[in-house]
Regions:
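Active-site helix of classical SDR
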Residues: 12, 49
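A short helix-coil junction within the Rossmann-fold of NAD(P)-dependent oxidoreductases
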Residues: 14-24
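Residue(s) in the substrate-gating loop at a strand-loop-helix junction
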Residues: 33
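Active-site-adjacent segment of SDR/Rossmann-fold oxidoreductases
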Residues: 38, 59-70
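Active-site loop immediately N-terminal to the catalytic Tyr-X3-Lys motif
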Residues: 40-44
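C-terminal helical subdomain
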Residues: 73, 89-125
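Short, flexible catalytic-loop segment of classical short-chain dehydrogenase/reductase
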Residues: 76-86, 90
């Protein structure tokens, strides 16, 4: 929670007054996770922190509507890194860190609030979130 959520809150709180003073448009880009869509096995704190970050980004988006600050949320699926190399569970539709970095950069340049990737995995996660909480639903990700 400290890194995935509170660090963002503290950094943005420290930066907002400076950003509002700027004449040019500023962009705050928060990187969430598809783990914010549904709870995943053995990842309760991670999922909760990313869900909090998603809600925070949505709130900031509305709070800064009539200012020079543009808020973006990037919601990736699994990204291959040294951390994910240690995972012992399936990571469907995993993308490279280079691909993720490219998508995050493009998100900062887009007109959309939220950028998700891979899109097909996003829709799978959304579909699972609409199902009743049942062990067989989460088995799709194991």
């Amino acid at each position: 929670m400290n890194i995935n959520f509170l660090a963002h809150v503290h950094l943005i709180n420290k930066s907002v007054s400076y950003l509002l003073e700027q004449t040019n448009k500023s962009t705050i880009c928060l990187v969430g996770s598809m783990a914010s869509i549904i709870g995943l096995p053995n990842a309760s704190a991670y999922c909760a922190s990313k869900a909090a970050l998603t809600s925070y980004a949505q709130t900031l988006y509305f709070d800064f509507q009539n200012t020079n600050i543009d808020v973006k949320l990037v919601t990736p699926g699994f990204v291959k890194t040294r951390l994910t190399d240690k995972n012992t569970f399936k990571m469907p539709m995993i993308v490279t860190s280079e691909y993720a970095a490219d998508q995050i950069y493009k998100a900062t340049e887009s007109n959309k609030f939220e950028t998700v990737f891979p899109k097909r995995f996003y829709w799978v996660m959304k579909y699972l979130s609409w199902l009743p909480m049942h062990k067989s639903a989460i088995q799709l990700l194991r």
